């Protein structure tokens, strides 16, 4: 089923969206590597685009909060408290990665939004 395939190692790569980690921290707080923000955004969007539309919201959720795989491995939860950049601020932005202003990618909801993650950063 769709739900069971949206796990790391199946429709979602292991530790998905690692490029998005730095894009999110740079975009929300101006902290992170000294790469051009547009290049970081392009890398993040490419990683997100490579994930099937029906799993993109789950991949963003894993980036935000992590997951324990069926084999017991902890994956994701790449957003961490950074000096001057609290994790909650990054979590509030992460669901916006699929929106028109950011990567503009369709999801399981049929458009560029993750209904299941709205308000997740609050």
Curated annotation (Swiss-Prot):
The keyword Secreted applies. It is found in: Secreted. Keywords: Alpha-amylase inhibitor, Disulfide bond, Protease inhibitor, Secreted, Serine protease inhibitor. InterPro entries: Allergen/soft/tryp_amyl_inhib (IPR006106), Allergen/tryp_amyl_inhib_CS (IPR006105), Bifun_inhib/LTP/seed_sf (IPR036312), Bifunc_inhib/LTP/seed_store (IPR016140). PROSITE patterns: CEREAL_TRYP_AMYL_INH (PS00426). It comes from the Eukaryota. GO terms for cellular component: extracellular region. Pfam families: Tryp_alpha_amyl. Disulfide bonds join 6-55, 20-44, 29-85, 45-103, 57-114. One of its GO terms (molecular function) is alpha-amylase inhibitor activity. Seeds. Its main location: secreted. May play a protective role against endo- and exogenous hydrolytic activities in the Ragi seeds. Belongs to the protease inhibitor I6 (cereal trypsin/alpha-amylase inhibitor) family. This is Alpha-amylase/trypsin inhibitor. It comes from Eleusine coracana.
């Amino acid at each position: 089923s769709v739900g069971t395939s949206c796990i790391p190692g199946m429709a979602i790569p292991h530790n998905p969206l690692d490029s998005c980690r730095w894009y999110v921290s740079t975009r929300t707080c101006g902290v992170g590597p000294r790469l051009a923000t547009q290049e970081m955004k392009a890398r993040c969007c490419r990683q997100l685009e490579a994930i099937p539309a029906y799993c993109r919201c789950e991949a963003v959720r894993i980036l935000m909060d992590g997951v324990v795989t069926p084999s017991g491995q902890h994956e994701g939860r790449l957003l961490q408290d950074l000096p001057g950049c609290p994790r909650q601020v990054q979590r509030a932005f992460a669901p916006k990665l699929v929106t028109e202003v950011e990567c503009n990618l369709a999801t399981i909801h049929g458009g560029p939004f993750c209904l299941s993650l709205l308000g997740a950063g609050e």
